[in-house]
Amino acid sequence: VQALEVDNGSGMCKAGFAGDDAPGAVFPSIIGRPKQKSIMVGMGNKDAYVGDEVQSKRGILIFKYPIQHGIVTNWDDMEKIWHHTFYNELRVAPEEHPVLLTEAPLNPKANREKMTQIMFETFSVPAMYVAIQAVLSLYASGRTTGIVLDSGDGVSHTVPIYEGYALPHAILRLDLAGRDLTDYLIEDSHGTCYSFNTTAERECQRDIKGKALLYCFDFEQEMKIAAESSSVEKLYELPDGNVITVGNERFRCPEVLFQPNFIGMEAAGVHETTFNSIGKCDIHIRKDLYGNVVLSGGTTMFEGIAERMTKELTNMAPASMKIKVVAPPERKYSVWIGGSILASLSTFQQMWITKEEYEDAGPGIVHRESF
């Protein structure tokens, strides 16, 4: 029986069958409820919409994101997202497949237990397992030791991993991620005479961010060139057919990751957070971490980000240290891909938590020593 894998992110849910090379379903982790009951006449009065359905009816719905900064904050809504994943997106009966779920680093124990309880009691899955997102990204890159900078829509983490185990004392969380960059781009582009304010327009911005933004290697230099010529400008066609010019926002927006003070945030940039995370690890493994810095998540998709990280870490690390930053081309989905690989390994099959074990031991069984 093929296992299912669901990677629940703050912004997008990625789901599919273990063993596949990419998730079969990718949709926004959003729940929408009607603003007023009466508007929905003739629409089969659903009390809640999920994912892409929400996007298409966005004018008449109130939006909620059940996952904030990587952590589930609303379990009723989360259950709806899982229900939608199994029955509408993957079209499977969850009681017939083992399910691999992913969780954010430092996810509270109670949350992990709640996920387990819902899977066994609501969806009657035969077996399940919960894996840490960054660890899966590392597996996807073919490594078991390294440090992962995972940056998604709602949160970024630096996670040092040694021989397959995340080192919890050295994990750092940065509440700066894709959504903040999108918001910054919205504010920044108000100067370009095209205003983005609703969630619909926010999606446009997310699109611009993906298509037009270039990561500059040398911020000051790029800004100087931008001031002197229009060679850095890119034209972008909006969904409504209008064309706008995206100028030096192309450098300013990604620069927020390295200089959070651009958006008034008092926090270390991603390079410094990575450096600090390595500094919390045993001195004997630091060399292995510096030599295996793996980028993961949609917010690391900017061009030139690996070169920039290498440059910044080289400036901060001891002079003799060899630094290698890897940005796999499929890193937007590397968490999911790592899970797909893991759940297909013959050695992993004994790691599943079965329904019987759950019934004997209760939700706490999920904390059993991981793989």
Curated annotation (Swiss-Prot):
Pfam families: Actin. Gene3D superfamilies: 3.30.420.40, Actin, Chain A, domain 4. Transmembrane segments: none annotated. CDD domains: ASKHA_NBD_actin (cd10224). It comes from the Eukaryota. PROSITE patterns: ACTINS_1, ACTINS_2, ACTINS_ACT_LIKE. It is an enzyme of class 3 (hydrolase). GO terms for molecular function: ATP binding; hydrolase activity. Its EC number is 3.6.4.-. Its main location: cytoplasm. GO terms for cellular component: cytoplasm; cytoskeleton. Keywords: ATP-binding, Cytoplasm, Cytoskeleton, Hydrolase, Nucleotide-binding. It catalyses: ATP + H2O = ADP + phosphate + H(+). InterPro entries: Actin, Actin/actin-like_CS, Actin_CS, ATPase_NBD. It is found in: Cytoplasm, Cytoskeleton. Actins are highly conserved proteins that are involved in various types of cell motility and are ubiquitously expressed in all eukaryotic cells. Belongs to the actin family. This is Actin-2. It comes from Naegleria fowleri (Brain eating amoeba).
